């Protein structure tokens, strides 16, 4: 049975502070929830319609399942159109070491504010096989319901961590490619298989204090009249250039 207290708790998890205090976050949608058993995420409770429960009776055998009506699901959902099931999950422990980054290509996000952009970038990283995204502590929270939904499940396969970029970059030994307005032409730049791609804030770009760590400032050459590209599109274009150069 869905109690008022539980419904209130779920709705409170739209705020980062409440997620951190409770240690819980929300995952919605049949597709993403179906991927959870194979992930590192620990599910506390499931709230689902009878149709979903009947079709997935073998999933989550050790998890508390609460049957809800479509109307009840609508009351607790963060989606305009709820998708049969909502999972209440425990926030995972952050796992991060600068040494891990030294053997691969990773993305670094400086003060990225928009949840949609973060979700898109996580999905892009997953598409190109990039395993790590390192975010400044003031970037959008990956466990925001909007971010989770925008990733379409990719947050389960990409390790997203929050740390001091100044400290991390000071320890890093790889080349750092920073997306800036007046850098080297992306298509004339050699991007090795191992390195860091830094994407800055949507409005102000990479923080001036971090630019000293950017060994290779790069720019996507403009052909038309658009003023700029959003962070997600810029990340996709640069990741594609990296993938093409390092295709086996």
Which functions belong to the PLM regions below?
Residues 1-53, 139-140:
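Boundary-proximal intrinsically disordered activation/regulatory segments immediately upstream
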Residues 29, 113-120, 229-232:
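Amphipathic alpha-helical repeat scaffolds
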Residues 178-226:
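Active-site/ligand-binding-proximal alpha/beta "capping" segment
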Residues 59-69, 104, 175-176, 190-196, ...:
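Active-site regions of enzymes building and remodeling cell-envelope glycoconjugates
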Residues 38, 93-182:
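RNA substrate-binding interface of SAM-dependent RNA methyltransferases
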Residues 84, 126-128, 139-156, 208-248:
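Structured adenosyl-cofactor binding patch, chiefly the S-adenosyl-L-methionine
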Residues 65-90:
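Glycine/small-residue-rich loop that forms an oxyanion/phosphate-binding "nest" at active or ligand-binding sites
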């Amino acid at each position: 049975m869905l109690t008022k207290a539980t419904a209130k708790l779920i709705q409170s998890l739209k705020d980062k502070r409440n997620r951190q205090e409770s240690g819980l976050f929300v995952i919605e949608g049949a597709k993403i929830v179906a991927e959870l058993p194979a992930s590192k995420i620990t599910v506390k409770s499931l709230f689902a319609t009878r149709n979903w429960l009947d079709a997935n009776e073998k999933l989550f055998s050790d998890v508390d399942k609460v049957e809800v009506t479509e109307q009840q699901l609508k009351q607790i959902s963060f989606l305009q159109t709820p998708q049969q099931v909502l999972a209440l999950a425990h926030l995972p422990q952050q796992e991060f070491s600068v040494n891990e980054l030294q053997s691969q290509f990773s993305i670094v996000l400086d003060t990225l504010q928009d949840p949609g952009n973060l979700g898109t970038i996580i999905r892009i990283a997953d598409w190109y096989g990039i395993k790590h995204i390192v975010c400044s502590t003031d970037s959008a929270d990956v466990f925001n319901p909007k971010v989770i939904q925008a990733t379409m499940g990719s947050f389960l396969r990409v390790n997203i961590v929050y740390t001091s970029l100044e400290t991390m970059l000071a320890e890093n030994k790889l080349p750092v490619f920073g997306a800036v307005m007046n850098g080297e032409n992306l298509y004339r730049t050699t991007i090795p298989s191992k390195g860091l791609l830094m994407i800055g804030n949507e409005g102000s770009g990479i923080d001036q204090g971090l630019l000293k760590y950017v060994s290779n400032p790069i720019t996507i050459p403009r052909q038309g009249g658009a003023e700029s590209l959003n962070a997600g599109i810029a990340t996709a274009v640069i990741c594609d250039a990296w993938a093409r150069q390092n295709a086996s």
